[in-house]
Structure formats: structure tokens, C-alpha cells
Amino acid sequence: MKRIPEPFRIKMVEPIKMTTLADREIALKEAGYNPFLLRSDDVYIDLLTDSGTGAMSDNQWAGIMLGDESYAGSRNYYNLCSAVEHFFGYKLTVPAHQGRGAEQILFPALIERMRQVRGGETPVFISNYHFDTTAGHIELNGGKAINVVTEEAFDTTTPYDWKGNFDLNKLVETIEEHGSKNICAIITTVTCNSSGGQPVSMENMRSVYEIATKYDIPVVIDSARYCENAYFIKQREEGYADKSILEIIREMYQYGDMLTMSAKKDPMVNIGGMCCIRDHQELFQAVQTRCVPMEGFVTYGGMAGRDMEALARGLYEGADEDFLHYRISQVQYLGERLREGGIPIQYPTGGHAVFVDAAKILPHIPADQFPAQALCNALYLEAGIRAVEIGSLLLGRDPETGEQKASELELMRLTIPRRVYTNDHMDYIADALIELKNRAHELKGLMFEYEPPVLRHFTARFREID
């Protein structure tokens, strides 16, 4: 993939400040050795997430000034509905403040439908790989989240184009094991964040939908990074090279019945999400019923009118092919720099981040001492760069036994915000991590000082193990 320069001009900048090592040592200790608890002023380059951290365009900012803040029936809501139908073909839209808001109004409705319509008793959701908040919402509502991602996802060194794919045999086996009446939904996560921002092929999405249809199970598309997934399909899958991103997106969403979206990723807004349903009026009404007490009235769902307008415009900008080429190329550039420096990563690189294989860099730190978290802390001390753990810490404990689950992958995610950093920043990141690798054997594992019962990685506190 030939890299291109940024397909935009920079109109506004925000100064960032390098701190001293002594400053960073104090800041990290005060944060309980958890990068989530660092103050942003103490961070030089912030790679914690691409969620809500991108730069909006002049067109989106112009839309902000056209916000209709009517409590009910905002024109910006209808602009958003029009954009949703244009891209996805779904007619029913409920806004939410972000992706987890969409999940918390949809999942209980799916569980209720499983019990009342399907006669099920034990709610189960199956995904290629549930992300943390998705699994958290399922478990908080008494459900079980099961992942059936392809085995190739767990081999970080072997190139494979579709490391986000479902293992179709495991999918069928899981449905049969738990009984189709207990399966609330199959969740297709595009791209698959927990396996390294890896794409799902169109063929796999189609096959999953065929299996779901056979068993009468609805399919939810977790759509945080659907544009990046569409771009990978165009680049890698036979028969799609000459199709537009719009055409590919429209076909992808034929293989789903509804979607949840954190719009803070591909549409490049700072806040917002939505739950959209193809045409199931009864389910739509159930979601609306939960929206009012949980998120807000059904035509704003926790979002200001101005933010809905920015989101409607961002749906178009995120699907621009020139932007996507630049976006994926920048992530790939960082990945190649790291590989040249001997850093093991999930390969090929995914769409929104480079995932560093911390288990290979820190083989002396066991999974229950969180090697990827230790590497995140060391990178912050080295260069003021904030990354995030995707491994056993995020995976959590078995809800039935309380035992720590060992993740198949211990990854440090270097998440690249959209339209924010240049390749000079990528070089700085690569140089810092390559330098850190030379003293990786000195790093220590971590143990909890405070462990929250749910989604613990956000607010947990740690100490180093001597």
C-alpha cells in the first residue's frame, strides 16, 4: 500500500507539552499504575483510544452551528436518519450518547424477546469477539458472552487477511450446545478490536447471516469501525476492488438486522452513538421505551442537536476513500517501523491501531501479572506516550468461578486518533518503543490494590510486584 500525505490542511492546533521522567513517575504512581487514571495534561502523545479523540472537519464544525436543540423532533435527528438509511438501509434509528448507551437500550430488549418470543431461559450472545463494554453490558443483564473468533487471530506473526472472522464451525457448535432458543443475538464486530483491529470478510459476514437465519437468530453488527472494515474488503477480498466504499458498506449491512455504533470512531465526532434497526417495528418500540428513561427522548437520545448534525456529516466523511487510504496507511507505517525494530506486533496491522505482542516482549511476566499493562506503564515512563492494555486485565474473571481468565493474546494497543497526529509522531512512538525493548527484562508485573467488580481496567489501581 503506497502511503499518501494527509488529505487535509490543518486549520487549528493544540499545543502538547513534554514532561520530565520525574514528573511522569509521580503522575503514574498517583494514577495507581493505571494509564486510564492519568491526567491528559501529563500525557505527551495519547494513544489510549480512537474513541472521541479525532479531529472534526470544518464541515462538521459548520454543522455544529446549525444545531436544532428542540427537545422533540429536532431537524438534526432527521438529517441523521437520512444518512443512516443512505449508508446502511436501516429505517429505524434511536440516537444514544455513545456506543454503550446503544447497547444498554438494545440488549435488555433482545433478552426479553428471547424469553417471551423464543421461550429461552438462559441468555447467550455469540460474537467473533465481544469488546469489553459489550461483554460487560451482557453480563450486567444476566447474559453470557461467548467469543468464536478464528484461530488465526491468536497467531500474531502469521499473515492472514481476516483475523476478525468468525470460526463458523465453532459458531454452529456453540448454538447447538446452548440451544438456539437461548441465543439472544449473534454480534458481528467490525473491525474486531480485541483481535487487533482485524477485519471480517464479506464472505464470512454472509455465512454468519445464513447460519443465523437458519436458526432464527437476529444479527447485530457492532459498527464502531465499519468504514475501516469496508476498506479492507475493497483492498483484500476478491470481487470488491472495483466497488465503492458505499457499495461495500451497503452490502455488509444486508448481513445484519440491526446495528449498534459508537459514532466516536469512524464518523469522527467527540460524542455520540446509535442503535438502528432494519424494519422490526416491535423491537424498535422496545428500544425506544428503554431510551427515554436511560438516554433521553427518542429523537435525541442523550445527544445535543448540534452533535447529531456533526455525526450525520461525519458518516459521509468517514467513508471517503482518500481519507481511509491515508488512515490505514498511517497505522501500517507505524507497524512497519516497529517490525523493522524487532517489535512483535499483530500482523498484518489492523485498521485503527498497532497491537504490540507484550507476551513476547515480556515472557517473564505471567498473564495474571498483566504484562501488557506493565508495558503500557513503561512506555509512558519512557516517552510520555499513553497506550492501553488489551489482554487478561481487560478480559477479567470468570463470572461463575471468580478465577482470573488468561487471555489468548496479551496486547498493548497503540491507538491512532483520526486526523490528529502526523507521521513524525509515529516515528517518535516507534523510536521510544524500540529503545524500551532493550531493557524489557527489567520490567515488573503488577498486582491489584483495588479491583472493581465490573469493567475493572478503567478504574483499578495497582502496585508493582518486587
Swiss-Prot record:
Requisite cofactors: pyridoxal 5'-phosphate
What GO MF annotations does this protein's record show? tryptophanase activity
Catalysed reaction equations from the record: L-tryptophan + H2O = indole + pyruvate + NH4(+)
The protein's Enzyme Commission number: 4.1.99.1
Q: Which UniProt keywords apply?
A: Lyase, Pyridoxal phosphate, Tryptophan catabolism
Pathway it works in? Amino-acid degradation; L-tryptophan degradation via pyruvate pathway; indole and pyruvate from L-tryptophan: step 1/1
Q: Which residues form the signal peptide?
A: none
Annotated InterPro entries: ArAA_b-elim_lyase/Thr_aldolase, Beta-eliminating_lyase, PyrdxlP-dep_Trfase, PyrdxlP-dep_Trfase_major, PyrdxlP-dep_Trfase_small, TNase, Tryptophanase_CS
Gene3D superfamilies xref list: Aspartate Aminotransferase, domain 1, Type I PLP-dependent aspartate aminotransferase-like (Major domain)
Pfam families cross-referenced by the UniProt entry: Beta_elim_lyase (PF01212)
Residue numbers bearing the N6-(pyridoxal phosphate)lysine modification: 265
Database matches in CDD domains: Tnase_like
**Which HAMAP family has this protein been placed in?**
Tryptophanase (MF_00544)
User: What family does the entry list?
Assistant: Belongs to the beta-eliminating lyase family.
Its subunit composition reads: Homotetramer.
Q: Which PANTHER family match?
A: BETA-ELIMINATING LYASE-LIKE PROTEIN-RELATED, TRYPTOPHANASE
NCBIfam families linked to this entry: PRK13238.1 (NF009709)
What is the protein name for this chain? Tryptophanase
